[in-house]
């Protein structure tokens, strides 16, 4: 997809994108071994965006970043998503980050969908015990553990299905 850009356009685009995520243009000449983990993560995301994809898949791409860098990158991705009509599949254990960038959320546990919302405005209504654990990041209480174990046993037996709670919100029962 880079064929449509001249070398000069690629260079200026690269520098512009680096600045947008808090890196200077001098990073264009550095080798990966000269970069920190967070710098590498940002550059990998920018590299994927250089090709102007229609869909971007980010799998735990913000893990290990400090909160300021994470916020800067989320702001950039949110802006790019709107400006370029980019679809982002954002895989993360940070439900807060997903909330910030998502139009809808699908929560999975052990490879199965346990809850999903089509509209981020329904975020506060997420209610599955596993989702609650993700949202609050707190130690699990005895009652929450019992609820979770109940769902886990049903899951193991294959006795689960997604039920529509209200339009745009489905939960495993």
Task: Give a label for each model feature.
Residues 98-100:
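A short, surface-exposed alpha-helical micro-motif characterized by mixed small hydrophobic
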């Amino acid at each position: 997809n880079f064929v449509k850009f001249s070398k000069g356009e690629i260079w200026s685009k690269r520098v512009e994108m680096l600045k947008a995520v808090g890196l200077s243009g001098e990073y264009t000449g550095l080798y990966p071994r000269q970069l920190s983990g967070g710098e590498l993560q940002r550059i990998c995301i920018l590299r994927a965006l250089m090709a102007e994809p229609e869909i971007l898949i980010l799998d735990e791409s913000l893990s290990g970043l400090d909160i300021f860098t994470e916020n800067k990158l989320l702001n950039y991705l949110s802006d790019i998503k709107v400006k370029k009509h980019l679809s982002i599949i954002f895989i993360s254990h940070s439900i807060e980050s997903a909330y910030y960038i998502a139009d809808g959320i699908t929560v999975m546990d052990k490879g199965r969908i346990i809850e999903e919302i089509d509209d981020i405005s329904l975020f506060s209504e997420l209610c599955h015990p596993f989702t609650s654990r993700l949202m609050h990041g707190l130690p699990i209480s005895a009652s929450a553990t019992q609820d979770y174990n109940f769902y886990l046993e049903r899951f193991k037996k294959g006795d689960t299905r997604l039920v529509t709670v209200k339009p745009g919100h489905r939960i495993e029962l």
